[in-house]
Amino acid sequence: MSIYDEIAQIVGPENIHTDYIERLCNSRDMSVHQGIPDAVVYAKTTEQVSAIMKLAHRDKVPVTARGSGTSTTGAVLPVRGGILLDLHNMNKILEINKKNFYARVEPGVICMQLNNTLGKDGLMFPPNPGSEIIATIGGMVSTNASGHRAVKYGTTKDYIKGLKVVLVDGSIIETGSITPKTSLGYDLTRLFCAAEGTLGIITEIICKLEPKPEYGALALAVFGNVNAAGDAVTEVTTSGIKLAGCEIMDKNSIKVVEKALGKDVTKIEALLIMEADGAKEVVVRDMNRIGDICKKYNVLEYEWTDDPARREEMMRARGGLVPTLSRIKPGNRLVAIAEDLGVPSTKIPETIRRAQDIAKKYNILIATFGHVGDGNVHTTFVCDVRSRDDWNRLKPAAEDLVKTAMEMKGTLSAEHGTGLTRAPHIALQLGPAFEVMRKIKQAMDPDNILNPGKMGLEKGKKADLYDYFTFQPLVEHPEGVNSYGLDIDNEVLACIHCGFCRLGCPTFSVTQRESKNARGRNALAYYLMNGSIEPSRELADAFYTCTTCQACTYFCPARIKVDEIVEAVRKKLYKSGYVPEPILGVRDNIIKMNNVFASAKAERIEIYPPALKEKAKKGELKAKAETLLFMGCVPSYLDMKMVPSLLKPLDAAKVDARARNFTRKTL
C-alpha cells in the first residue's frame, strides 16, 4: 500500500487527488514560479493533519501547506513534489470571546468573512491584506501579512495570541496564551509567524481582536511633486496625528488608473489617500489638520469625507490599480519579483525616484505605490511575459531595487513573505542571523520535509530569481506552441492567479476542487497553450463542467474573459475527439428537438393562458410585437410556469409582447 492509499484512508478517497490534471491546477500562485505536487490532499481536522505528517515523516515525503493560494512569492508551491496539503476546508470559527477580545479559528477561515462575523458584535481583526476577500488567516500568519491599516494597527503577528501546530513528526503543540500578556519562555508563537510552513503546519489560531472604530474618514491629496507629498506625510505622521491608513501612488500608477480617477493626470506626480478612525471629534479635527499641512506643501487638490459611498469611490483607483496593470497592453501583465520593499517612511520619496530611474535605465514599466505610512513600497513590473528581452531586463532591474532597499536600511519584504522570489537575497539582508534560521530549520525539520526549497534555507544550492520559472516554455516559443489566437492567448496571460474567482464559481462551490474553478481552468489553458499537456478526457472534464456563467469574471479584478478561454479550449478538445458523452447527448437533443432538454414544443404550450394557448395552436400569434421576451432554457423547459406567470401581468398592463420562439422551432 502506497502512502497515498494510506492517506486516502485518513481523509477519505474523495479528499485526495493524484490525477495529473488536478495536480497541475494546484501548481501556480501569483508568482512567476510553478511547482507540481504528487498529490493534492484536503484535510479537515488537526488529527488528520497529524496522521498525514506521521506518514510523510516516515517516508520522507515533502509536505507543502496551502490556503487560498494567493502568494506572490511561490511560498505555497510544492517545488519538490510530494503532498500539497490544502487547508481551505478547515474554515470554522471555533470561538468568539467578546469579553476577552479573542477568537479561535481554523487556518482556512477567510479574513473578510471573519471580520464580517466580528462586525456584528462591534469587533474586528485589524490586518487587512489586499486579498482579504479570499486570504485565509493561516496564510496571513504564515507570511505575517498586513495591509493599508498597518500604519496604525500593525501586522498579523501583532494579533496572534497563540497557535496549534503540527510538527514534522506529527506531534501537536500549542503556543501562546489567551491572557493579555505572558513572558514565559521563548515566544514560539512568533517563531511560526512568517515561517511559511517550513517549521510546522498551523491548524488553529487564537486571534487578538479590537473594538471597531465608531467613526472613520478618508482624505485625498493630489500633488505635483513627489517630494512634497513625502514631506507632507512625514509632517502628518510626526505631528501626533494617528493615521489608520496612508497610501501613495506615483505618476506611473496614476496614469494607469486615470479613467478611474476621472481627471487629467498630466500634472500629477503623486497621490495620497489618508484614513483616520476613532472618536468623531478627533477624526474631524485631524482631517482638517491634515489639509492644513498639505497646503504648506503646495497640494493641488485636497478633500476629505466620511460618506461611505464617497470613500469607496476615492479608494476605487487604488483598489483597481493592481489588476489594471495586467490590462495596460494586450499580452503584458504585472510581474511580482521585487514588489514588496520596506523602507523608513521618510525615505519613501527617494525610493520612488530611484524606482523611476531604474525603470528608465532598463526601459521597463515600474508602477510604484504602497502603504507610505508604514514605509511599504510596491514596485511592480509590467512586461510581455513572452519576451526573453523583457525578462533579461527585469532581472538586473530587480537587483537594483534590492540594492536600493538595502541602502535605505530597509527590508526586501514588508508583507508578502519570502518564498522562492526573495530567497536569492535573504542572506544579504539578514547576514549572520540567516545561519541561525538555518539551524532552527535543521533542528525542527532535519529531513527537510516541510515546504522544501523555500526561503533559501538549503545549503549548497544558490537560489535564483527565475527558479522553477513557469514562463520558460513561453519564452522559448513566444508564438505559443498551441496558440488559441492572439486575443485569447492574451486573456490567458492576463490572469494573475489571485483566486478571487473562487467567490463566484458555482462548480467550485459544489466540488471545492481547483480543476472546477476558473483559476485552475486557466492554468490548464496555459499549460495546453505552451505545450506542457495534450488534450485528454480528464482535460475535457475540467472544461465541459464550466457553465460559462461568467460569475468568475464578475469577481475577477482584471475581468478576464474566462468564458472565451473555455470556449477556445473546447474547440481544441472537440477537434481532438475529446467531448464528454453527456455533451454529445445535449448536441443530439438540439439536432432532434431544437432544445437541450429534448422537450416537445406542445408540452410547453399546454400550461399557457387559455387565450394564448388557443392562438398558439392555431398559429395566430403575431409575427412582430413591440416587446420581445427571451426567457432562456430553464424557464422555457424546466420551470415553465415562469413564462405564463410573467405574461399575465404584461397582458393586464396591455404590454404588446411575445415570448421568443412561439412561432419558431429553435427552442
Predicted regions: what they are:
Residues 75-91, 118-123, 147-157, 182, ...:
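A glycine- and small-aliphatic-rich helix-loop capping segment at beta-alpha/alpha-beta transitions
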Residues 1-54, 70-101, 130, 253-261, ...:
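N-terminal flexible segment immediately upstream of the FAD-binding catalytic core
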Residues 35-63, 171, 200, 274, ...:
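Soluble FAD-dependent oxygen oxidases
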Residues 18-26, 207-211, 217-396, 404, ...:
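C-terminal substrate-recognition/cap domain of FAD-linked oxidoreductases
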Residues 92-96, 102-247, 449-451, 456:
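FAD-binding subdomain of flavoenzyme oxidoreductases
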Residues 431-545:
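Ferredoxin-type iron-sulfur electron-transfer modules and their immediate structural context
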Residues 1-29, 58-61, 293-313, 407-429:
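N-terminal accessory segments
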Residues 522-667:
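Iron-sulfur-cluster electron-transfer modules
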